[in-house]
Amino acid sequence: MSLPSDRRQFLATTALGGLGLLGKLPAVSADEATLDTKVVHLDPGIEPLVRLLEETPRDRLLEEIAGRIKKGLSYREVLAALFLAGVRNVEPRPSVGFKFHAVLVVNSAHLASLAAPDQERWLPIFWALDNFKSAQAANVKERGGWRMPPVKEAAVPPARKARQALVDALEKWDTEAADVAVAGLVRTAGADEVTELLWKYAPRDFRSIGHKIIFAANARRALGAIGWQEHAEPILRSLVYAMLANENKAPGPDNPVDRFGRLNRELAKEVRAEWQDGKPDSAASTDLLAGFREMSAEEAGKRVVELLNKSVSPQSVWDAIFGAAGEMLMRKPGIVSLHSLTTTNAIRYAYQTAGDDETRRWLLLQAASFLPHFRGESATRKDKGYDLAFDTLEPMTPKASGHEAVDEIFANLSKDKLSAARKVLGYLKANPDPRPLTDAARRQVFRKATDSHDYKFSSAVLEDYAHVSPAWRDRFLAASVFWLKGSGGADTDLVRRTREALKG
């Protein structure tokens, strides 16, 4: 099993300001160690900490975890327990979103922690810990206290049959068969083999507005940090359960939320063998960006195939995809449009890590075809709209300069997002280094975040800034302003609680 870059980066930063020493939880009594036979059992090394998260009241959890950290509890242990507590106690039903964001946000919080200055590294994780308790309570209210059950061991297929059993179950949308099949596959196959298969199915449909592929990407990335061998089975059981949520929309070739995925599988076979050797073409990117304003999902896939077969670089296609997602947010900031960006981020990660050439082609077509679905869904919402275009937004020079200009932009952002976006363009024109802006954006999220999307969105767009060609990057960062946090208003009380808990 190869280690992804996320894992290598994580291993280089586990100290986290001197608080990440490899510590162990105190011994537990026999009564405390008794496990519910109706609930999935986790790795023995992490089970006590997960139970601590599950059983500690919300108003005491941050202080309890901080106390354990001071005694040697490691960042890696906290991250693992947080993810596992989520998948064991929060059901990805009726859709993969809402309360389930307690799971979806964990890797985003982790990425934010890696990018944070030492003194703020724990803020995203403590925010996610508190959010888990909120989701746990919602799960009790909405789903009757659902908890992940143990796998049905008698039905787990043998190693030689596990892969095909999972494929068959996913094709048939058979939840029970998929549950035992993924357990069998995880136990006997390597991480890359399992992930490669999941990339073929996680983004196949538009149900849950992209959360299925978001979960798949975040699960793979988090497992690279917390340990695949120890923790993959319960996490991937949750993932496959989420992937098969149909939201009362019967799967079928004629259902619009399924049709584009099936058509793109055939279209992917038409892409020339040398498709990755294409040349950068800014004009093609601009033309494709314009097309995304009107094209259907099926037309988007066909247009991308045409461009690739005309020797246009895949990067030029990605530029248009990122640009169109950014424009959607600019035009109508809201939950739907922000997910066009977080979904694109997740599909791009799958594309970067997939080993099968045909899967990579299909993922690129899917990234394009998701956008018209987002555009259509956004049109049904009542979010405030703006008549803006990604490629024609005019820069505005901030009145201040240097760090004071950054402060001006984020103060503006709280009142007038359009002016703030234009000032981002003006600032970057005079100061090509984006780090003062991106660092400030992260700080505001740490201090002002009130929703999982604040972390999911910011971690995605600040990462994808580097995935956009230089000529388009500044505009992409400017577009992201429409869902970033401004500096106005007080910090959340969680910031105070976290800092107080970690003192000493």
Regions from the language model: what does each represent?
Residues 2-504:
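Mature, well-folded catalytic/scaffold domains that follow N-terminal targeting or propeptide regions
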